[in-house]
Amino acid sequence: MFEKPVVKTFQYGNHTVTLETGVIARQATAAVMVTMDDTAVFVSVVGKKEAVEGQDFFPLTVNYQERTYAAGKIPGGFFKREGRPSEGETLTARLIDRPIRPLFPDAFKNEVQVIATVVSVNPDVQPDIPTMIGTSAALAISGIPFNGPIGAARVGHIDGQLVLNPSNTELEASKLDLVVAGTESAVLMVESEADNLTEEEMLSAVVFGHDQQQAVIKAINEFKAEVATPAWDWVAPAENTALVTKIAELAEAKLVEAYQITEKMARYDRIHEIAGEVNEVLLAEDPEANTKEIHTIFHDLEKTVVRRSIIAGNPRIDGREKDMVRALDVRTGVLPRTHGSSLFTRGETQALVTATLGTQRDAQIIDELTGERKDHFLLHYNFPPYCVGETGFVGSPKRREIGHGKLAKRGIAAVMPSVDEFPYTVRVVSEITESNGSSSMASVCGTSLALMDAGVPIKSSVAGIAMGLVKEGDDFVVLSDILGDEDHLGDMDFKVAGTNTGITALQMDIKIEGITKEIMQIALNQAQGARKHILSVMDEAISGAREDISEFAPRIHTMKISAEKIKDVIGKGGAVIRALTEETGTTIEIEDDGTIKIAATEGAAAKEAIRRIEEITAEVEVGRIYTGKVARLADFGAFVTVLPGKDGLVHISQIAEKRVEKVSDYLTEGQEVQVKVLEIDRQGRVRLSMKEAVEKPAEEANDASEAKGE
């Protein structure tokens, strides 16, 4: 029934990787099962043979899904099945998409869908690298026009050494978590988080990862040759040279002038006018003219005009030189009731950022295939349509918003205090209120400012900068602080975040081959200068965390009790701690080692909660006098509560100096009395006395003094 499967096994660092095709999903255009040391991912590729007529974009979809059965688990929740993609799945899908998208021919508009399903997971091998390898292999054997294959590698930096594909355990000790993907000759994508590494260390890691992944590319090429799928009979549509020439005649000179308008919306209005004029002329000449084709050629002409001007050394679209950063405006404390806030403006890009402090109970619980963990630092990025002067749908975050938020979080993570140093959950929200390039890096700057404004003791300020590149032949120009148009029309988007001493995050997407180590070095060095300039302006506004947190933020007080006393504070069915929180208006968290964290916006409430917990956990001391409350009467005496949850017996003979016939003649339930602790027996029973707690008459005291010779 089955043809013999094609299997390719190769060594990749310390891991054994196997590629297999020919058994599963035979109706897909291509399908590969990739296994890396018990982590297995099944990748399918389906491409449509025909493009939708008139379609002017490439409809590539990448879906990445983790099945809980891969880790031997059953999903939680009511429905007991996987639902919408998690944030982690969305980020991995973007990680796969970014390096493969530039490798399809520009004119290829056929729909392609990649679906990667994690079907087995080794807790020490993250699925993202094998998924990228499997995607590359599936596309390589599909016959679809694809200028791959690509390789992928994770690089760690442990004890000063670069490590290929470190395990999850090793990553905990690593100063770097970097993923690099590329073809045999070029790096295409970098995604990383670092602990203040230098530019040289980061570049070495990128080059190391690219060198090591050549083993993957070689293996996929051999796998492709063995599968021997015929290439699609696809030819790029012939260019309409007559229309290209006509549009250039009509619009080129006008576009050159339009791109000298420095204000974004005014420039867009003028370009829109020019496009309308071109359409009007061409449709008058030929009412059947293809408006989508006209639009595509017009856009290509825009790209040519801008790139040619930059390569020629002319000022950029907004009049800046290549290494200039736009005008900065930095403000903190802009919102009165938030715990921390900032407004960071760089040219026509602006972020309103808030920081909110919560208790550890507010931490996000993340249920991953490799286990459950808590995240005490949350960063959410919102990109509403008004920030670019448009209308649009407002709802749950899109892939781009999730990706940009994660990048900003990576940039800040290295300077965040540990939970032991700062026992709060911190949530940052970046609202992009204006956008013209690099809003994610504006979010990094705004986050650093808002955290300091909130009193979060971050180790240092962090700033981010986006770099761009225009390359024509051997000529190239590296641009600092790119505009949205420069990002769109350029060859590279290179985002760097860091402190004055090093890099904390690096993200790179390259659209062309031929980006050398030297070009990346120039970009990193230029980014360093821009980053330090931004940091100097930020430090003028606020250079360190405020001494105190906001009056509106919960203040966390920490105390320690014996672990044996935890059950007393919690009470039966949680009754005691529930009463404590409700009556004092505090939030109380108890850890297994007896550490108690009390969060309250008012100091008096926290003090009251601490006092009551101390009472609950206090030990009864022999010889000490307590003010207790009569809990219950008995024929032989009375039970008196001396501490919360701790009763003792006052025997009838210990109620008064004279003989007591009936306990109720002297005591009633609820009455407050002074009692002295006489004894605590081996079973923990407390014996009390009222008569011993009563002060002796003055003459007895004097007799006692004389007896001592006073």
Curated annotation (Swiss-Prot):
Named cofactor requirement(s): Mg(2+)
Residue ranges, annotated region (Disordered): 691-710
Enzyme Commission identifier(s): 2.7.7.8
Main location: cytoplasm
Matches recorded under CDD domains: KH-I_PNPase (cd02393), RNase_PH_PNPase_1 (cd11363), RNase_PH_PNPase_2 (cd11364), S1_PNPase (cd04472)
Subcellular location: Cytoplasm
InterPro entries xrefs: ExoRNase_PH_dom1, ExoRNase_PH_dom2, ExoRNase_PH_dom2_sf, KH_dom, KH_dom_type_1, KH_dom_type_1_sf, NA-bd_OB-fold, PNPase
A molecular function (GO) term: RNA binding
Xref: SMART domains: KH, S1
GO annotations of cellular component type: cytosol
Catalytic reaction list: RNA(n+1) + phosphate = RNA(n) + a ribonucleoside 5'-diphosphate
The keyword Ribonucleoprotein is annotated on this UniProt entry: no
Binding site for Mg(2+): 487, 493
UniProt keywords, alphabetically: Cytoplasm, Magnesium, Metal-binding, Nucleotidyltransferase, RNA-binding, Transferase
Enzyme class: transferase
Family under the similarity heading: Belongs to the polyribonucleotide nucleotidyltransferase family.
Reported function: Involved in mRNA degradation. Catalyzes the phosphorolysis of single-stranded polyribonucleotides processively in the 3'- to 5'-direction.
HAMAP family associated with the record: PNPase
PANTHER family: POLYRIBONUCLEOTIDE NUCLEOTIDYLTRANSFERASE (PTHR11252), POLYRIBONUCLEOTIDE NUCLEOTIDYLTRANSFERASE 1, MITOCHONDRIAL (PTHR11252:SF0)
Record text on subunit structure and interactions: Component of the RNA degradosome, which is a multiprotein complex involved in RNA processing and mRNA degradation.
Protein name: Polyribonucleotide nucleotidyltransferase
Gene transcribed to yield this protein: pnp
